[in-house]
């Protein structure tokens, strides 16, 4: 199969390309006079990539999953939020180590590791994930603008306004990576203050918050709560975020000729990522707890009667006057807070959503750059890449805005977009496990056998959870008729076949399958230009480098 073996995409595009990070802009790491295990100065120098990475855990899609979980299951799913952040931290640590040790990010390694056709498929899948994520962020920002303007700026205009994000990103990026990281920290702080304010005002029951966080159980939960728990997990583990994090760590100038310096970088990046994701967890906890306290076991009629006296709140009649359990999304969540605590609470909520959308769109743009640089290797000016990335995301969003006939019908797109991103997850998770387990890439920094097995198990569970969620979404929205399965059947088989294709490469990298097996369409011995400058001698005894 020629397309699956030795074809080279460099025949189609020039290999030379503009590097996002190089030695002239990479942050230098200070040298301490004293050889101490920990240095605050060094931690500060390494601080930044983890916060940019953590934005994916705070995007509008995650916020909406949080508020729906709170309204539906009260505090009972907080432990799912905690577990998903812990698993995410372990996976992000692997992604960061890959970038530090190899000196390349995931897309660049995939270009060298896989044959032509598989890597083109990988590239397209990740681009789809980026576009879907960007659509969520565009919609979230447009909703925030709608609420901040008290409904005077319609959703369609709000979507068009988000084009300015591109120019904002280009303007900030000109001043260097540290300035950009500061902006992201400011946006995360804005979210923490906004959602923290709502948490304080709502006064959740702290004992229930603590119990829901540490007790891994959901008493009295049924099918709907299980699906909600799955959506929380799926919304947190974002496929394109692994590609992003492995590239962001390259913004630090790490001496790869020194094993000590590489280990040091891995340590500080792990500490920074753990802190950033801890902040992310508490922000998500704030949102879930607010709506657990305010909307659990409430009906649409309850909220409708609350909103009758608030003429200053736009669309205060969004909740129908019936006895059905209340359903809520980003837009309705803001309206509810306005009806409960006044216009100021709605504005604070909108500011938090705006910050989430702004930060997520900029990281999505960055990810699009890295993916294009690695997979396609097209030498484009940065402004052109940014504009095209945003145009691809805005075009389908505009179409949805026109067809949705109003903001009330559009915000429910979150479940569909989360579903599409879940479909893409194996195409980031499996390659990452493969690369970090490979001796040819990581050498003596490859993940240990226990961690390999743990990550494989996590991967299988995560993919299984996502497949279950996708099945539920399809059957609930399109039914279970034979025609549906006839239509999606061929695509499902191709999807599973490609996952198995990637899984075989992963098993070979983990040495669970012999690379001497001659399988059609596989090339286990592609030449990789990954050096190991920290290794002074190149002989190996029992897989240990000396």
UniProtKB/Swiss-Prot annotation:
It is found in: Apical cell membrane; Cytoplasmic vesicle membrane. InterPro entries: NRAMP_fam. It comes from the Eukaryota. GO terms for cellular component: apical plasma membrane; endosome membrane; intracellular organelle; plasma membrane. Induction: Slightly repressed by high levels of Mn(2+). The keyword Glycoprotein applies. It is a multi-pass membrane protein. Signal peptide: none annotated. Residues 1-42, 92-119, 174-181, 250-270, 356-386, 437-453, 505-546 are cytoplasmic. Expressed in dopaminergic neurons (at protein level). Primarily expressed in mc1, mc2 and mc3 epithelial cells of the pharynx and vpil-6 pharyngeal-intestinal valve cells displaying an anterior-posterior expression gradient. Expressed in gonad sheath cells. GO terms for biological process: intracellular iron ion homeostasis; iron ion transmembrane transport; manganese ion homeostasis; manganese ion transport; response to manganese ion; response to metal ion; transition metal ion transport. The chain crosses the membrane at residues 43-63, 71-91, 120-140, 153-173, 182-202, 229-249, 271-291, 335-355, 387-407, 416-436, 454-474, 484-504. Residues 64-70, 141-152, 203-228, 292-334, 408-415, 475-483 are extracellular. The keyword Transmembrane helix applies. Probable divalent metal ion transporter which regulates Mn(2+) uptake. Belongs to the NRAMP family. HAMAP family: NRAMP. This is NRAMP-like transporter smf-2. The gene is smf-2.
């Amino acid at each position: 199969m020629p397309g699956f073996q030795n074809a080279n995409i460099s025949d189609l595009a020039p290999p030379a390309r503009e590097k996002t990070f190089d030695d002239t802009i990479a942050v230098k790491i200070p040298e301490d006079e004293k050889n101490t295990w920990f240095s605050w100065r060094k931690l500060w120098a390494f601080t930044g990539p983890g916060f940019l990475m953590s934005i994916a855990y705070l995007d509008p899609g995650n916020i909406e999953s949080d508020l729906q979980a709170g309204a539906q299951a009260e505090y009972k799913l907080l432990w799912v939020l905690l577990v998903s952040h812990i698993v995410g931290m372990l996976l992000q640590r692997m992604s960061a180590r890959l970038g530090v040790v190899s000196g390349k990010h995931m897309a660049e390694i995939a270009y060298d590791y896989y044959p032509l056709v598989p890597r083109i498929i990988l590239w397209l899948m990740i681009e789809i994930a980026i576009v879907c994520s960007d659509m969520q962020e565009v919609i979230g920002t447009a909703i925030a603008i709608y609420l901040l303007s008290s409904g005077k700026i319609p959703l369609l205009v709000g979507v068009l306004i988000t084009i300015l994000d591109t120019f904002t990103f280009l303007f900030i990026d000109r001043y260097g990576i540290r300035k950009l990281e500061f902006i992201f920290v400011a946006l995360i702080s804005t979210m923490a203050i906004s959602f923290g304010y709502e948490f304080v005002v709502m006064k959740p029951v702290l004992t229930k918050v603590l119990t829901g966080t540490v007790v891994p159980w959901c008493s009295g939960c049924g099918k709907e709560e299980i699906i909600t728990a799955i959506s929380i997990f799926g919304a947190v583990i974002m496929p394109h975020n692994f590609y992003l994090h492995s590239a962001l760590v390259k913004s630090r100038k790490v001496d790869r000729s020194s094993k000590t310096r590489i280990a040091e970088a891995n340590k500080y990046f792990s500490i920074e990522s753990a802190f950033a994701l801890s902040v992310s967890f508490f922000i998500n906890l704030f949102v879930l707890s607010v709506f657990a306290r305010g909307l659990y076991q409430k009906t649409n009629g309850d909220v409708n009667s609350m909103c009758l006296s608030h003429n200053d709140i736009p669309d205060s009649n969004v909740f129908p006057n019936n006895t059905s359990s209340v359903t809520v999304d980003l837009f309705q969540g803001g309206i509810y807070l306005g009806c409960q605590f006044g216009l100021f609470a709605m504005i604070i909520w909108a500011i938090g959503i705006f910050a989430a959308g702004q930060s997520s769109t900029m990281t999505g743009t960055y990810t699009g750059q890295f993916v294009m640089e690695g997979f396609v290797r097209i030498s484009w000016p940065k402004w052109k890449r940014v504009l095209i990335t945003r145009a691809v995301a805005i075009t389908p969003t505009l179409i949805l805005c026109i067809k949705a006939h109003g903001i009330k019908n559009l915000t429910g797109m979150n479940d569909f977009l989360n579903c599409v991103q879940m479909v893409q997850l194996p195409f980031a998770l499996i390659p990452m496990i493969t690369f970090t387990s490979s001796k040819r890439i990581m050498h003596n920094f490859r993940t240990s056998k226990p961690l390999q097995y743990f990550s494989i198990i996590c991967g299988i569970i995560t993919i299984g959870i996502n497949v279950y969620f996708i099945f539920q979404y399809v059957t609930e929205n399109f039914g279970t008729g034979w025609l549906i399965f006839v239509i999606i059947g061929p695509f499902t088989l191709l999807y599973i076949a490609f996952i198995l294709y990637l899984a075989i490469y992963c098993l070979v990298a983990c040495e669970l399958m012999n690379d001497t097996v001659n399988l059609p369409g596989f090339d286990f011995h592609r030449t990789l230009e990954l050096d190991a400058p920290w290794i002074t001698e190149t002989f190996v005894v029992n897989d240990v480098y000396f």
